[in-house]
Amino acid sequence: MTWHPHANRAKTFLLLAVFSGLIVAVGAMFGRNIMFLAVLFALGMNAYVYFNSDKLALRAMHAQPVNEMQAPVMYKIVRELATTARQPMPRLYISDTAAPNAFATGRNPRNSAVCCTTGILQMLNERELRAVLGHELSHVYNRDILISCVAGAMASVITALANLAFFASMFGGNRDGGTNPFAILLVSLLGPIAATVIRLAVSRSREYQADQSGAELTGDPLALASALRKISSGVERAPLPPEPQLADQAHLMIANPFRAGEKIGKLFATHPPMADRIARLEAMAGRGPGQY
C-alpha cells in the first residue's frame, strides 16, 4: 500500500511554511543571537520529545504491554492490518481506564506502539475496533509523530524568541538594531498565540489524513464513522481527568479525551469537529472503494 496524504499533506506543508516565515520574521526583528539561542533550545527540547514520545505518552496513560494471549482480538486486527500495509507489527498496550480512546506513538514504524483503553475495547464491536486501529496505524505510517515534533519545534522557536526578546528588552533592548520596545511587547504577546494556533491546525490536518488513510487501509469508512460517534458520546460520559500530563498527550488520541464543554474554540482544538470527520467518512463511503 502506498501512503499518500493528498490535499492534507499540502495543507500541512503550507502550515509549516507559514511557521518558517513567522520564525524568520520574528528572528529578523530581534537579531541573530536571540534567534540562535531560540532555535538551539527548541531543537534540543523537541529532539528529546521525538526520541521519547512513546515512553512519555504510555507513562502518562499508565499503559501496560499486552501480548496475543492477553488481547487476542486487538492483536489479530493489528497483525492483519500491518501485514496488509507491509509494515512492521507495533508494540501493543492497554490503558486501564473507562475513558474510550486510543492512540499511536513512536518515531517510525519500527519503533511504534498502539494503545487502546479498556473503555474503547468494551464499547466497540470488532468492525469498529478494526477501523480505529487502522486510523492509529495510519498515524505511524504517515510519520505524524515526526510532523508533530517539527511543528512543535517551530512553535517552541517562536515562543522562545518572544520570551528571550522580552527579557532582553528589559535589560537594555536590542543593541544590534534598536527595535521599538512596543513592537517587542506586541510580538512577545501575539507570537506564542500564533504559533499555538498553527501547531494545532497541523494536528487537526493530520487527524483528517489519518481518518482517510485508515479508511483506505480497512476499506470501511462507515465503521470508523460509527466508532467516532460512539467514542464522542462515550467521552462525554467518561472523560479523562484534566491533568497536565494527560493534556500534553491529548493530540495523540483518536478523539479529544475531555468533555466538549472544556474546549475553548476551534482554533485551539487538538482535533477537528467530530461531525465534520464523520461527514467526510460518509462521503468516502458514498464514492466507493476505488475512488477514495
From Swiss-Prot:
Known cofactor(s):
Zn(2+)
A Pfam family that the UniProt record links to this protein: Peptidase_M48
Q: Which GO terms describe its cellular component?
A: plasma membrane
Q: What is its main location?
A: membrane
Q: List, from the UniProt record, the residues annotated as the active site of this protein.
A: E136
Query: What is its subcellular localisation?
Result: Cell membrane
The gene that this protein is the product of is htpX
Asked if the record carries the keyword Cell membrane, the reply is: yes
Phylogenetic classification of the source organism: Bacteria, Bacillati, Actinomycetota, Actinomycetes, Mycobacteriales
Which parts of the sequence bind Zn(2+)? H135, H139, E207
- PANTHER family registered for this protein in UniProt: PROTEASE HTPX
UniProt keywords, alphabetically: Cell membrane, Hydrolase, Membrane, Metal-binding, Metalloprotease, Protease, Transmembrane, Transmembrane helix, Zinc
According to UniProt, the name of this protein is Protease HtpX homolog
- One Gene Ontology MF term: zinc ion binding
Cofactor comment text? Binds 1 zinc ion per subunit.
Supply the EC number(s). Answer: 3.4.24.-
Q: Cell membrane: present as a keyword of the record?
A: yes
Organism whose genome encodes this protein: Mycolicibacterium gilvum (strain PYR-GCK)
- Similarity comment text for this entry: Belongs to the peptidase M48B family.
Membrane-crossing residue ranges in chain numbering: 10-30, 33-53, 145-165, 182-202
Q: Which domain of life is it from?
A: Bacteria
Membrane topology term: Multi-pass membrane protein
Q: Which GO terms describe its biological process?
A: proteolysis
CDD domains named in the record: M48B_HtpX_like (cd07336)
